[in-house]
Amino acid sequence: MTDALKRLSDEGVAIWLDDLSRKRITSGNLAELIDQQHVVGVTTNPSIFQKAISQGDGYDQQLADLAVRGVTVEEAIRMITTADVRDAADILRPVYDNTGGKDGRVSIEVDPRLAHNTHATVAEAKQLAWLVDRPNTFIKIPATEAGLPAIAETIGLGISVNVTLIFSLERYRKVMDAFLTGLEKAKERGLDLSQIHSVASFFVSRVDTEIDKRIDALGTDEAKAQRGKAAVANARLAYQAYEEVFGTDRWAALEKAGANKQRPLWASTGVKDKAYSDTMYVTDLVAPNTVNTMPEATLLATEDHGEITGDAVAGSYERARADLDAIEKLGISYDEVVQLLEKEGVDKFEDAWNDLLKSTEAELKRLAPSKG
């Protein structure tokens, strides 16, 4: 056992857990992770809730109560998921208070079927914020083209946002622009900018998974030399973009008005390829004012044998650019890969949501009172 998680936290990395279930809440496990593993936030997504609700009996009582009331499947899902987020937010509330609202956050995602509908996404974000009714909630909005104006409008309403499914550097810059636009709207409306927080979830491991697959198809030694380099390089260049945007006069004016920076959040940090270190997407992306949301296995691996040796991003930009250029020269299109990953990301969450609808409907029918 190492003190890696403490050192990670000391380096300015907020450690969040990429998982939530009722069992994790009621068993005291979440409180234990906060107390002992330096966890200061939680992220959820449709896949996480689908897994949580379809496994075990932790939701049976609430589902039975909802079945008696005759609620729709979608109403049931919203009541179940917002209840978990609300309870997790209450457990994390002391962290929220102690960090001035920066951490102690729980994220809940808008219906992924709305990813390409700006107005419906904003309406859903407002409804979720109202339903959870906790100040330490982040509403997750995907960084699709339609999501960008929704992000700006939601921030402009004073709602804190976790922007998700970011894969490309170009899209990340647009996300930061949407965030700044939202803050400018909020300022015009007379809102307190200091109460608005945001993170931008930049996905990591999926980039290596897709690019490595294409490298393996090429099969040359030159190609194989680039395995496992794309994701970290991409994320490091994202941090460079973050430094540039939050060094502008536009940002300075908002900061003077009380605004908080939108932090980069490294998401999808579980290592899929056993050839790599199981902590590489943590140890190789240590940088000040970032968040790393980890599956529990990655969190525990980092605690056990993670080597935290200070800032791993500063001074890395030239090497990172060279790595991406070398991959492009192999004939692997960066733009094609990141566009595919965004589409697949939205599709995966939509599929998980549809599976959640089906399994919840089946449970409501099973637990409904018999007629007669």
Swiss-Prot record:
Pfam families membership: TAL_FSA (PF00923)
CDD domains per UniProt: Transaldolase_like
Matching InterPro entries: Aldolase_TIM (IPR013785), TAL/FSA (IPR001585), Transaldolase_2 (IPR004732), Transaldolase_AS (IPR018225)
Transmembrane domains' residue ranges: none
Catalytic activity reported: D-sedoheptulose 7-phosphate + D-glyceraldehyde 3-phosphate = D-erythrose 4-phosphate + beta-D-fructose 6-phosphate
GO terms for biological process, alphabetical: carbohydrate metabolic process; pentose-phosphate shunt
One GO cellular component, as annotated: cytoplasm
Recorded GO MF terms: transaldolase activity
Subcellular location per the Swiss-Prot or TrEMBL entry: Cytoplasm
Pathway the protein acts in: Carbohydrate degradation; pentose phosphate pathway; D-glyceraldehyde 3-phosphate and beta-D-fructose 6-phosphate from D-ribose 5-phosphate and D-xylulose 5-phosphate (non-oxidative stage): step 2/3
Entry's EC annotation: 2.2.1.2
Keyword terms: Cytoplasm, Pentose shunt, Schiff base, Transferase
Alphabetized SUPFAM superfamilies for the sequence: Aldolase
Primary subcellular site in the record, as a coarse category: cytoplasm
Catalytic site: K140
Gene3D superfamilies, A to Z: Aldolase class I
Record function comment: Transaldolase is important for the balance of metabolites in the pentose-phosphate pathway.
Sequence similarity: Belongs to the transaldolase family. Type 2 subfamily.
HAMAP family: Transaldolase_2
Name of the protein in its database record: Transaldolase 2
Organism per entry: Streptomyces coelicolor (strain ATCC BAA-471 / A3(2) / M145)
Lineage: Bacteria, Bacillati, Actinomycetota, Actinomycetes, Kitasatosporales
Gene that encodes it: tal2
